[in-house]
Swiss-Prot record:
Residues 21-195 form the EngB-type G domain. Belongs to the TRAFAC class TrmE-Era-EngA-EngB-Septin-like GTPase superfamily. EngB GTPase family. PANTHER family: ENGB-TYPE G DOMAIN-CONTAINING PROTEIN (PTHR11649:SF13), MSS1/TRME-RELATED GTP-BINDING PROTEIN (PTHR11649). Coiled coil: none annotated. InterPro entries: G_ENGB_dom, GTP-bd, GTP-bd_ribosome_bio_YsxC, P-loop_NTPase, Small_GTP-bd. Keywords: Cell cycle, Cell division, GTP-binding, Magnesium, Metal-binding, Nucleotide-binding, Septation. Its cofactor is Mg(2+). PROSITE patterns: G_ENGB. Gene3D superfamilies: P-loop containing nucleotide triphosphate hydrolases. It holds the Pfam family MMR_HSR1. It comes from Mycoplasma capricolum subsp. capricolum (strain California kid / ATCC 27343 / NCTC 10154). One of its GO terms (biological process) is division septum assembly. Necessary for normal cell division and for the maintenance of normal septation. This is Probable GTP-binding protein EngB.
Amino acid sequence: MIKQASFITSAANKSNWINDDVSEICLIGRSNVGKSSFINSLTNNNKLAKISNTPGKTRLLNFFEINKGEYRLVDAPGYGYAKVDDSIKIQFAKMMEEYFINRKNLKGVFLLLDLRHKPSNDDIMMYQFLKHYNIPVVIIGTKLDKLKKNEYIKNEKMIKEAINFYQEDDFIKISNLNKTNIIKCYELINKLLGSK
């Protein structure tokens, strides 16, 4: 469970990362996938992560302290927004590559995918990148409340096929609106952190 959560800092590059040994779970996904809402649902704080009406605007890693230093959630910029300049996309890719490959604190990644849609090329590349570097990853399927049962069963299969899903990974369907499976996400965080 998350009993306490607070924003610590935003970092545009490695020099601004927090230098300690506290474990981190990174959250990443396309712009407007529901990442900020997911953080707010996890922490039971609707004001913690700002929900932007301007997708693709944030180019910073946002660090959140959980349970007074037990671990951190790291909110990565949303990717795949067409109106962002190519130079910013390249800067984002370099920053995330550096973070994912070299960040010793990183224990795993929650990759958020919209259950309503086929994964984009960016989604597929992100998942395969994480697998290539042996970074533990959990797929979080968002916006469950927007689909009927027969739709989300069919769409989960479609998403898994599109990203070439590895069976050893966890795939969980959530709704930020009605908190479906949010408790299960705490279990997956503990699993990534190495807790029993």
